[in-house]
Amino acid sequence: MSEALELLGQDIVARAPGVLGHSVAFGELTIVARAASVIDTLTFLRDDAACRFHQLIDLTGVDYPERAARFDVVYHLLSLVKNHRIRLKVSTDEDTPVPSVTPVFPVADWFEREAFDMYGIFFDGHPDLRRILTDYGFHGHPLRKDFPMTGYVEVRYDDELKRVVYEPVKITEFRAFDFLSPWEGAKYALPGDEKAQ
């Protein structure tokens, strides 16, 4: 199987527009392409007789804050005819939008909105690029590695005001909970054990 994927990868690199390279790892083919040519590359992968990747299964982002091109946009494709899966990766930074692939795969609409909402990756030409999982007034992008784990605001329902309120996050004091299980056979003495003897 990996030999067939290696041959397919070599064929795609030789003939597809904008492809920079390929690799096969753990039985999966990964193609790396230029972000500017992602529409042409995906159109080739969909329409070429040797590929026939007619389904876009998923589109997501990956954050590498130490790189200049911080984000990878990863497209997972499936060919039911050839019984192959493929991964296409393109890199971009925080300011450079990636062309929207909704003209090639309409299902990418909500996937791109999710990548925008969670990572802040912009998609040029998207028909409706707005938040999909977080509130409209939400600040930041929660799946970025520099986003604080506590977030910026706390959202709760206030019974007195009868509405949802947003408050700055308050870090509570650190508490260590030591739950001792009597079934684990503790060998040390606890306060009050002297009374039992």
Swiss-Prot record:
Main location: membrane
Key words, A-Z: Cell inner membrane, Cell membrane, Membrane, NAD, Quinone, Translocase, Transport, Ubiquinone
Membrane topology reported for the UniProt record: Peripheral membrane protein
Gene3D superfamilies: NADH:ubiquinone oxidoreductase, 30kDa subunit (3.30.460.80)
Residue stretches spanning the membrane: none
Keyword NAD: yes
A single Gene Ontology CC term: plasma membrane
EC number, as in UniProt: 7.1.1.-
PROSITE patterns for this protein: COMPLEX1_30K
Alphabetized GO MF terms: NADH dehydrogenase (ubiquinone) activity; NADH:ubiquinone reductase (non-electrogenic) activity; quinone binding
Catalytic reaction equation(s): a quinone + NADH + 5 H(+)(in) = a quinol + NAD(+) + 4 H(+)(out)
Compartments, record wording: Cell inner membrane
Role noted for this protein: NDH-1 shuttles electrons from NADH, via FMN and iron-sulfur (Fe-S) centers, to quinones in the respiratory chain. The immediate electron acceptor for the enzyme in this species is believed to be ubiquinone. Couples the redox reaction to proton translocation (for every two electrons transferred, four hydrogen ions are translocated across the cytoplasmic membrane), and thus conserves the redox energy in a proton gradient.
NCBIfam families in the cross-refs: NuoC_fam, PRK06074.1-1, PRK06074.1-5
Stated family: Belongs to the complex I 30 kDa subunit family.
Subunit description: NDH-1 is composed of 14 different subunits. Subunits NuoB, C, D, E, F, and G constitute the peripheral sector of the complex.
Name under which the protein is recorded: NADH-quinone oxidoreductase subunit C
Record organism: Caulobacter vibrioides (strain ATCC 19089 / CIP 103742 / CB 15) (Caulobacter crescentus)
